[in-house]
Amino acid sequence: ENSLRGEAGSKTVLRDREGRIVDDLDYGRAPRFGSDLHLSIDSRLQYIAYRELKSAVVGHGAKSGSLIMVDVKTGEILALVNQPSFNPNGPINQREPTRNRVVTDFYDPGSTIKPFTAMAALESGRYQSETMIETSPGYFWVDSKMIQDPVNLNTITLAEAIQKSSQVAIAKVALDLPRDAVFDVLQRSGLGDYVGTGLPGEVTGLFSNVGMQSRVSRTAMAYGYGFTVTPLQLASAYV
């Protein structure tokens, strides 16, 4: 705020009987102009994002939705919209308090976390993208919990496990890695911490490695359950 505001200058002037300045007598202090603020938001992309998100929320009968578009090269936010939305220039007449859901709401990220588990596998040196993983008969038991895919994918590569979103393959990979391998990749990606945009109301979600000694907890984290993130955190993690 101080950078944008600037500072007023001062000078002594001579005025005529009508109050008009007729001469500058002394310049006490030159004014300091405030700095410019350039937004990363692209108004065209913001409009398209708003239109498409509203259509998707209505089309799926959802109660709410958020969309954030990030430049993968710079990390700049190009578009950020929520539904339901509101016009800040008009009266607000909504039953539910209006908030910026991209930074205030958190949820289980689900299968969007599987690529991070694959990254942990690649970093371990035990896996390559073409490493084969057996998923037959389409399910397996981890202690008392059954993990299953919608269909039996048989033997697939690590890359195919991401493409086909296989719970079984990803869970088996997680159990084959060191206990905190997946957690460490997620933590390095920024989960569990503030993104630092300065947007008011930002929360960090719930993210901890407590309970990672449990095989069930390790597999759940590998495919995006047992912890929560904000849409902003998830988008930033992919950059």
Predicted regions and their residues:
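Extracytoplasmic/periplasmic proteins that interact with beta-lactams or build/remodel peptidoglycan
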Residues: 1-66, 86-89, 93-97
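Beta-lactam-recognizing serine transpeptidase/beta-lactamase-like catalytic domain environment
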Residues: 15-28, 41, 71-111, 116-239
